[in-house]
Protein backbone atom coordinates (compact mmCIF):
# COMPACT_ATOMS: atom_id res chain seq x y z
CA UNK A 1 0.00 0.00 0.00
CA UNK A 2 1.36 3.41 -0.99
CA UNK A 3 1.79 5.82 1.90
CA UNK A 4 -0.09 9.13 1.68
CA UNK A 5 1.99 12.17 0.84
CA UNK A 6 1.70 15.36 2.85
CA UNK A 7 -1.52 14.65 4.74
CA UNK A 8 -3.14 17.80 6.09
CA UNK A 9 -5.95 18.24 8.59
CA UNK A 10 -7.47 20.68 11.07
CA UNK A 11 -9.30 20.48 14.37
CA UNK A 12 -11.64 23.24 15.50
CA UNK A 13 -12.07 24.26 19.13
CA UNK A 14 -15.48 23.58 20.74
CA UNK A 15 -16.09 27.34 20.82
CA UNK A 16 -15.87 27.39 17.01
CA UNK A 17 -18.53 24.70 16.77
CA UNK A 18 -20.69 26.33 19.43
CA UNK A 19 -20.59 29.84 17.96
CA UNK A 20 -21.07 28.77 14.35
CA UNK A 21 -23.55 25.93 14.79
CA UNK A 22 -24.84 25.93 18.36
CA UNK A 23 -23.32 22.56 19.19
CA UNK A 24 -22.55 21.89 22.85
CA UNK A 25 -19.90 19.77 24.53
CA UNK A 26 -21.39 18.86 27.88
CA UNK A 27 -20.88 15.46 29.49
CA UNK A 28 -23.54 13.82 27.32
CA UNK A 29 -21.46 14.60 24.23
CA UNK A 30 -18.81 12.28 25.62
CA UNK A 31 -20.87 9.48 27.16
CA UNK A 32 -24.46 9.39 25.88
CA UNK A 33 -24.62 6.84 23.00
CA UNK A 34 -27.33 8.53 20.94
CA UNK A 35 -25.77 11.96 21.39
CA UNK A 36 -22.32 10.61 20.45
CA UNK A 37 -23.55 9.13 17.21
CA UNK A 38 -25.74 12.09 16.25
CA UNK A 39 -23.21 14.82 16.98
CA UNK A 40 -20.24 13.10 15.35
CA UNK A 41 -22.40 12.57 12.25
CA UNK A 42 -23.59 16.17 12.29
CA UNK A 43 -20.07 17.56 12.71
CA UNK A 44 -18.90 15.63 9.65
CA UNK A 45 -21.82 16.93 7.62
CA UNK A 46 -21.10 20.51 8.68
CA UNK A 47 -17.41 20.18 7.83
CA UNK A 48 -18.36 18.99 4.36
CA UNK A 49 -20.80 21.84 3.83
CA UNK A 50 -18.16 24.39 4.79
CA UNK A 51 -14.92 22.81 3.57
CA UNK A 52 -15.89 19.89 1.36
CA UNK A 53 -13.80 21.40 -1.44
CA UNK A 54 -10.75 20.72 0.75
CA UNK A 55 -11.70 17.12 1.46
CA UNK A 56 -12.98 17.75 4.98
CA UNK A 57 -16.03 15.98 6.35
CA UNK A 58 -18.42 13.70 4.52
CA UNK A 59 -21.33 14.70 2.30
CA UNK A 60 -23.60 11.89 3.40
CA UNK A 61 -21.93 11.12 6.71
CA UNK A 62 -23.24 7.80 8.02
CA UNK A 63 -24.13 7.07 11.62
CA UNK A 64 -21.04 5.53 13.18
CA UNK A 65 -20.12 4.07 16.59
CA UNK A 66 -17.33 6.52 17.46
CA UNK A 67 -16.59 6.25 21.17
CA UNK A 68 -14.59 9.46 21.70
CA UNK A 69 -14.26 13.08 20.59
CA UNK A 70 -11.94 12.58 17.62
CA UNK A 71 -13.07 15.75 15.83
CA UNK A 72 -12.00 17.97 18.73
CA UNK A 73 -9.41 16.04 20.72
CA UNK A 74 -10.15 16.43 24.40
CA UNK A 75 -11.11 14.29 27.35
CA UNK A 76 -9.63 13.44 30.69
CA UNK A 77 -10.69 9.94 31.61
CA UNK A 78 -7.41 9.00 33.34
CA UNK A 79 -7.54 12.09 35.58
CA UNK A 80 -11.18 11.31 36.35
CA UNK A 81 -10.40 7.70 37.23
CA UNK A 82 -7.72 8.93 39.64
CA UNK A 83 -10.13 11.27 41.40
CA UNK A 84 -10.03 14.63 39.61
CA UNK A 85 -13.30 16.48 39.10
CA UNK A 86 -14.00 17.33 35.47
CA UNK A 87 -15.98 20.45 34.62
CA UNK A 88 -17.77 20.11 31.29
CA UNK A 89 -18.67 23.14 29.16
CA UNK A 90 -21.02 23.93 26.31
CA UNK A 91 -18.41 25.92 24.39
CA UNK A 92 -15.06 24.58 25.56
CA UNK A 93 -12.95 21.57 26.29
CA UNK A 94 -13.51 19.96 29.69
CA UNK A 95 -11.55 21.49 32.56
CA UNK A 96 -9.66 19.33 35.02
CA UNK A 97 -9.89 20.63 38.58
CA UNK A 98 -6.53 19.66 40.16
CA UNK A 99 -6.66 17.52 43.28
CA UNK A 100 -3.54 19.14 44.81
CA UNK A 101 -2.86 15.96 46.76
CA UNK A 102 -0.57 16.06 49.78
CA UNK A 103 2.60 14.00 49.99
CA UNK A 104 0.82 11.45 52.18
CA UNK A 105 -2.09 11.24 49.74
CA UNK A 106 0.31 10.64 46.84
CA UNK A 107 1.97 7.78 48.72
CA UNK A 108 -1.50 6.31 49.31
CA UNK A 109 -2.47 6.63 45.63
CA UNK A 110 -2.85 3.31 43.82
CA UNK A 111 -4.08 2.03 40.49
CA UNK A 112 -7.76 1.23 41.09
CA UNK A 113 -8.01 -2.46 41.95
CA UNK A 114 -11.15 -2.81 39.84
CA UNK A 115 -10.74 -0.06 37.29
CA UNK A 116 -13.90 -1.10 35.44
CA UNK A 117 -15.91 -0.24 38.55
CA UNK A 118 -14.81 3.40 38.61
CA UNK A 119 -17.63 5.75 37.52
CA UNK A 120 -15.89 7.15 34.44
CA UNK A 121 -14.70 3.75 33.23
CA UNK A 122 -18.18 2.32 33.78
CA UNK A 123 -19.56 5.15 31.65
CA UNK A 124 -17.05 4.53 28.84
CA UNK A 125 -17.56 0.77 28.85
CA UNK A 126 -21.34 1.17 28.90
CA UNK A 127 -21.06 3.49 25.89
CA UNK A 128 -18.90 0.95 24.09
CA UNK A 129 -21.24 -1.94 24.89
CA UNK A 130 -24.33 -0.13 23.65
CA UNK A 131 -22.70 1.09 20.44
CA UNK A 132 -21.16 -2.29 19.67
CA UNK A 133 -24.50 -4.00 20.27
CA UNK A 134 -26.14 -1.69 17.72
CA UNK A 135 -23.42 -1.48 15.07
CA UNK A 136 -21.38 -4.65 15.55
CA UNK A 137 -18.08 -2.77 15.72
CA UNK A 138 -16.47 0.30 17.32
CA UNK A 139 -14.32 3.21 16.15
CA UNK A 140 -12.45 6.05 17.81
CA UNK A 141 -10.92 6.27 21.25
CA UNK A 142 -10.62 8.42 24.39
CA UNK A 143 -7.56 10.61 25.07
CA UNK A 144 -5.33 8.92 27.66
CA UNK A 145 -3.00 11.87 28.31
CA UNK A 146 0.55 11.49 29.55
CA UNK A 147 2.24 10.72 32.82
CA UNK A 148 3.42 14.31 33.28
CA UNK A 149 0.07 15.90 32.39
CA UNK A 150 -1.82 13.70 34.84
CA UNK A 151 0.84 14.15 37.54
CA UNK A 152 0.37 17.92 37.47
CA UNK A 153 -3.40 17.52 37.71
CA UNK A 154 -3.04 15.25 40.74
CA UNK A 155 -0.25 16.98 42.68
CA UNK A 156 -0.53 20.57 41.50
CA UNK A 157 2.40 22.98 41.47
CA UNK A 158 4.24 21.05 44.20
CA UNK A 159 4.97 18.43 41.55
CA UNK A 160 7.73 20.61 40.13
CA UNK A 161 9.41 20.85 43.53
CA UNK A 162 9.05 17.10 43.95
CA UNK A 163 10.92 16.54 40.68
CA UNK A 164 13.98 18.03 42.39
CA UNK A 165 13.51 17.35 46.09
CA UNK A 166 11.33 14.23 46.37
CA UNK A 167 12.14 11.94 43.49
CA UNK A 168 11.02 8.79 45.32
CA UNK A 169 7.55 10.30 45.60
CA UNK A 170 7.34 11.18 41.91
CA UNK A 171 8.61 7.72 40.96
CA UNK A 172 5.63 6.25 42.81
CA UNK A 173 3.24 8.79 41.28
CA UNK A 174 4.55 8.18 37.76
CA UNK A 175 4.23 4.41 38.17
CA UNK A 176 0.60 4.66 39.29
CA UNK A 177 -0.31 6.96 36.42
CA UNK A 178 1.48 4.90 33.76
CA UNK A 179 -0.22 1.71 34.91
CA UNK A 180 -3.62 3.44 34.96
CA UNK A 181 -3.11 4.75 31.42
CA UNK A 182 -2.25 1.24 30.28
CA UNK A 183 -5.24 -0.31 32.03
CA UNK A 184 -7.55 2.04 30.11
CA UNK A 185 -5.71 1.70 26.81
CA UNK A 186 -5.70 -2.10 26.83
CA UNK A 187 -9.48 -2.08 27.20
CA UNK A 188 -9.98 0.27 24.26
CA UNK A 189 -7.43 -0.47 21.53
CA UNK A 190 -8.29 -4.16 20.94
CA UNK A 191 -11.92 -3.19 20.35
CA UNK A 192 -11.50 -0.05 18.23
CA UNK A 193 -8.09 -0.49 16.60
CA UNK A 194 -6.90 2.88 17.87
CA UNK A 195 -6.02 4.55 21.13
CA UNK A 196 -4.86 8.07 20.15
CA UNK A 197 -6.72 9.38 17.11
CA UNK A 198 -8.38 11.70 19.63
CA UNK A 199 -4.95 13.22 20.39
CA UNK A 200 -4.25 14.12 16.75
CA UNK A 201 -6.54 12.69 14.11
CA UNK A 202 -3.91 13.27 11.40
CA UNK A 203 -2.62 9.76 12.18
CA UNK A 204 -5.83 8.31 10.75
CA UNK A 205 -4.42 9.26 7.34
CA UNK A 206 -1.49 6.86 7.65
CA UNK A 207 -1.35 4.77 10.88
CA UNK A 208 -4.37 5.06 13.18
CA UNK A 209 -2.98 2.47 15.57
CA UNK A 210 -0.18 4.70 16.87
CA UNK A 211 -0.30 5.32 20.61
CA UNK A 212 0.49 9.03 21.04
CA UNK A 213 1.72 10.29 24.39
CA UNK A 214 0.65 13.97 24.65
CA UNK A 215 3.57 15.61 26.41
CA UNK A 216 2.05 19.10 26.49
CA UNK A 217 3.71 19.96 29.80
CA UNK A 218 7.32 19.07 28.92
CA UNK A 219 7.80 22.73 28.02
CA UNK A 220 8.08 23.29 31.79
CA UNK A 221 10.89 20.85 32.57
CA UNK A 222 14.34 20.12 31.17
CA UNK A 223 15.23 17.25 28.84
CA UNK A 224 17.53 15.91 31.56
CA UNK A 225 14.69 15.78 34.08
CA UNK A 226 12.50 14.06 31.53
CA UNK A 227 15.22 11.54 30.71
CA UNK A 228 15.90 10.73 34.35
CA UNK A 229 12.36 10.62 35.75
CA UNK A 230 9.76 10.18 33.01
CA UNK A 231 11.20 8.62 29.86
CA UNK A 232 11.19 5.08 31.21
CA UNK A 233 7.44 5.27 31.83
CA UNK A 234 6.70 6.65 28.35
CA UNK A 235 8.90 3.97 26.79
CA UNK A 236 7.15 1.27 28.84
CA UNK A 237 3.74 2.47 27.68
CA UNK A 238 5.01 2.39 24.11
CA UNK A 239 6.00 -1.24 24.50
CA UNK A 240 2.57 -2.13 25.92
CA UNK A 241 0.53 -0.24 23.30
CA UNK A 242 2.74 -0.12 20.19
CA UNK A 243 3.58 1.59 17.91
CA UNK A 244 4.66 4.65 19.92
CA UNK A 245 4.35 8.31 19.03
CA UNK A 246 4.61 11.62 20.86
CA UNK A 247 2.69 14.87 20.79
CA UNK A 248 4.87 17.85 21.73
CA UNK A 249 2.97 21.10 21.23
CA UNK A 250 5.68 23.24 22.85
CA UNK A 251 8.28 25.13 20.84
CA UNK A 252 11.19 22.95 21.95
CA UNK A 253 10.35 19.53 20.51
CA UNK A 254 13.86 19.36 19.04
CA UNK A 255 15.35 19.18 22.55
CA UNK A 256 13.34 16.06 23.32
CA UNK A 257 13.33 14.41 19.88
CA UNK A 258 16.51 12.34 20.53
CA UNK A 259 14.90 10.99 23.70
CA UNK A 260 11.72 10.18 21.82
CA UNK A 261 13.85 8.35 19.26
CA UNK A 262 15.48 6.37 22.06
CA UNK A 263 12.00 5.33 23.24
CA UNK A 264 11.25 3.98 19.76
CA UNK A 265 8.95 6.70 18.43
CA UNK A 266 7.55 6.27 14.93
CA UNK A 267 5.66 9.58 15.06
CA UNK A 268 6.24 13.07 16.46
CA UNK A 269 3.76 15.94 16.58
CA UNK A 270 6.10 18.94 16.27
CA UNK A 271 5.03 22.14 18.02
CA UNK A 272 5.17 25.51 16.25
CA UNK A 273 8.54 27.18 16.82
CA UNK A 274 10.48 23.95 17.20
CA UNK A 275 13.55 23.21 15.08
CA UNK A 276 11.98 20.96 12.47
CA UNK A 277 15.25 19.99 10.79
CA UNK A 278 16.67 18.85 14.13
CA UNK A 279 13.54 16.79 14.79
CA UNK A 280 13.90 15.12 11.40
CA UNK A 281 17.59 14.43 12.03
CA UNK A 282 16.72 12.71 15.31
CA UNK A 283 13.83 10.75 13.76
CA UNK A 284 14.80 10.13 10.12
CA UNK A 285 12.21 7.42 9.47
CA UNK A 286 9.33 8.64 11.65
CA UNK A 287 6.22 10.51 10.64
CA UNK A 288 6.47 14.18 11.59
CA UNK A 289 3.29 16.23 11.94
CA UNK A 290 4.19 19.91 11.66
CA UNK A 291 1.82 22.09 13.64
CA UNK A 292 0.69 25.55 12.62
CA UNK A 293 -0.05 28.01 15.41
CA UNK A 294 -3.85 28.29 15.96
CA UNK A 295 -3.45 31.66 17.69
CA UNK A 296 -1.74 33.09 14.61
CA UNK A 297 -4.32 31.43 12.36
CA UNK A 298 -7.16 33.13 14.20
CA UNK A 299 -6.14 36.54 12.85
CA UNK A 300 -4.24 35.43 9.75
CA UNK A 301 -5.10 36.57 6.27
CA UNK A 302 -5.02 33.99 3.52
CA UNK A 303 -1.58 35.25 2.55
CA UNK A 304 -0.26 34.99 6.10
CA UNK A 305 -1.65 31.47 6.53
CA UNK A 306 -0.03 30.42 3.27
CA UNK A 307 3.28 31.96 4.35
CA UNK A 308 3.24 30.14 7.69
CA UNK A 309 2.52 26.86 5.91
CA UNK A 310 5.32 27.50 3.44
CA UNK A 311 7.65 28.23 6.35
CA UNK A 312 6.97 24.83 7.92
CA UNK A 313 7.52 23.01 4.64
CA UNK A 314 10.72 24.95 3.96
CA UNK A 315 12.04 24.29 7.47
CA UNK A 316 11.64 20.57 6.86
CA UNK A 317 12.89 20.66 3.29
CA UNK A 318 12.38 18.07 0.56
CA UNK A 319 11.55 15.29 0.31
CA UNK A 320 8.38 15.49 2.38
CA UNK A 321 7.96 11.75 2.81
CA UNK A 322 6.28 10.92 6.13
CA UNK A 323 5.51 14.58 6.74
CA UNK A 324 2.10 15.99 7.61
CA UNK A 325 0.71 19.47 8.29
CA UNK A 326 -1.98 20.24 10.84
CA UNK A 327 -3.54 23.06 12.82
CA UNK A 328 -5.28 22.01 16.01
CA UNK A 329 -7.82 23.83 18.19
CA UNK A 330 -8.60 26.71 15.87
CA UNK A 331 -11.06 29.03 17.58
CA UNK A 332 -14.07 31.03 16.47
CA UNK A 333 -12.86 33.96 14.39
CA UNK A 334 -10.44 31.94 12.27
CA UNK A 335 -11.10 32.90 8.66
CA UNK A 336 -12.29 30.25 6.24
CA UNK A 337 -9.92 31.60 3.61
CA UNK A 338 -6.98 31.15 5.96
CA UNK A 339 -7.91 27.48 6.28
CA UNK A 340 -8.24 27.16 2.51
CA UNK A 341 -4.89 28.87 2.01
CA UNK A 342 -3.25 26.34 4.33
CA UNK A 343 -4.70 23.39 2.40
CA UNK A 344 -4.00 24.84 -1.03
CA UNK A 345 -0.40 25.56 -0.13
CA UNK A 346 0.17 21.97 0.93
CA UNK A 347 -1.64 20.76 -2.21
CA UNK A 348 0.88 22.61 -4.41
CA UNK A 349 3.70 20.65 -2.81
CA UNK A 350 1.79 17.35 -2.92
CA UNK A 351 0.81 17.45 -6.56
CA UNK A 352 -1.39 14.56 -7.66
CA UNK A 353 -0.38 12.20 -4.87
CA UNK A 354 -2.91 10.95 -2.32
CA UNK A 355 -3.18 12.90 0.94
CA UNK A 356 -5.00 10.13 2.77
CA UNK A 357 -7.70 12.50 4.03
CA UNK A 358 -10.63 10.46 2.75
CA UNK A 359 -9.18 7.39 4.41
CA UNK A 360 -8.99 9.40 7.62
CA UNK A 361 -12.65 10.38 7.51
CA UNK A 362 -13.71 6.78 6.89
CA UNK A 363 -11.67 5.57 9.85
CA UNK A 364 -12.06 8.51 12.22
Summary of predicted features, one role per range:
Residues 90-126:
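A gly/proline- and charged-residue-enriched helix-loop-helix capping module
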Residues 35-86:
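Membrane helical hairpin/interfacial module
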Residues 1-36, 42, 49-50, 67-70, ...:
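Active-site loop segments of alpha/beta catalytic cores
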Residues 2, 59-60, 89, 100, ...:
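A generic structural signal for short, solvent-exposed coil/turn residues
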Amino acid sequence: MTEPYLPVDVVFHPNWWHRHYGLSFDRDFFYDPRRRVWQEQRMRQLLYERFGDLGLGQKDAPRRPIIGPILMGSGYIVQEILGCEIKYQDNGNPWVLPRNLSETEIWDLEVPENIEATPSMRALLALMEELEAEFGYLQGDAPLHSVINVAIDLRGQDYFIDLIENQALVAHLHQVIACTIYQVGRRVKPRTGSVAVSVNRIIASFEPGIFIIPNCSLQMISPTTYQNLLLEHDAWLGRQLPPLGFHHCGNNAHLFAPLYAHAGAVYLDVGWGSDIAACRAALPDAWLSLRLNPVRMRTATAGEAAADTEALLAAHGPPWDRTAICCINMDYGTGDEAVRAMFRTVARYRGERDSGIQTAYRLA
